[in-house]
A protein has these predicted regions:
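Membrane-helix interfacial "entry" motifs
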Residues: 8, 12, 56-60, 97, ...
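Short, aromatic-rich membrane-interface segments at the entry and exit
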Residues: 35-43, 60-63
Length: 269
């Protein structure tokens, strides 16, 4: 799910640093909003951006939408059941049993919290799916002036999970060849975790050591100036993309405030 989709699209051609700035604008906008309206509008815009500008296939978008809808459900339900109703003069109680109380206000808050989580996941997914890891590292170093050691460290981290996934598959196939079965139920899951944890940890440590030695051998950060084969430049389209998101977020906030739908964390209740 969280993998780079390598194909040509306007979103793929954007400068990663400016794309990251736009994603940061979306994340900050969602962080400040505790109502469902603002996160829902941001989520719709992210979905359309991935589909039209990122040219992500529609079926792929649907596959992404299923976990994107299921992941926030427990968070939304928890917040709906445990909303502090003392803040409301006349809360609308829908259901009550023991310590659990479900109200209209609680559902509104829970839905807002769940949609906020969905926005964070969708924004991260959009960035990862449309950003080449190498371009991202180069952009961090060249455009954002991050030290090369940290910039390429981000690149290594970016590619670390796929490496661990392949290592996991190798270990699983090796166990199958040796006739080691996978037990069922909780006991089987614990046993499988024990068998896989140590080899995966050893592989992670080994790869980290090799990466650190390779970075030291290339003298990252030792010289004041570095030359690059590929230059990452910020074009007009990159700036327009960031401005478009800023204007959209401002418009959504203006609508929410105008119609009394906004519940912002910096505004006293």
């Amino acid at each position: 799910m969280f993998t780079y989709l390598a194909h040509a699209s306007p979103l793929h051609r954007l400068n990663p640093a400016m794309k990251l700035a736009a994603i940061a604008v979306v994340a900050l906008a969602a962080t400040a909003a505790f109502d469902p309206f603002i996160p829902a509008m941001l989520l719709i815009a992210l979905w359309l951006t991935a589909w039209r500008l990122g040219r992500v296939p529609f079926l792929q978008m649907l596959r992404w939408s299923i976990p994107l809808a299921l992941l926030p459900l427990p968070i939304a339900l928890f917040n709906a059941l445990y909303t502090d109703l003392s803040r409301y003069a006349h809360p609308h109680i829908l259901w009550h049993w023991g310590i659990w109380t479900l109200s209209t206000e609680g559902l509104w808050n829970g839905l807002g919290m769940g949609l906020r989580v969905a926005v964070f996941v969708a924004a991260s997914l959009l960035f990862i799916a449309t950003t080449d890891p190498t371009d991202f590292a180069l952009s961090l170093v060249q455009n954002l002036k991050i030290p090369p050691r940290f910039g390429y460290g981000v690149l290594v981290s970016y590619r670390f999970l796929p490496l661990l996934k392949r290592e996991y598959e190798t270990i699983r196939l090796a166990h199958r060849v040796r006739g080691v079965g996978e037990g069922q139920g909780l006991r089987g899951w614990i046993e499988k975790t024990r068998r896989y944890a140590i080899p995966l940890l050893a592989a992670a440590v080994r790869k980290s050591e090799r990466t650190a030695l390779a970075m030291d051998a290339k003298a990252f950060g030792a010289l004041p100036q570095r030359t690059y084969y590929r230059q990452m430049v910020i074009r007009r389209g990159d700036v327009l993309f960031l401005l478009a998101w800023l204007l959209y977020v401002a418009a959504v906030y203006a609508l929410a405030l105008h119609f009394g739908l906004a519940h912002l964390q910096w505004v006293p209740g």
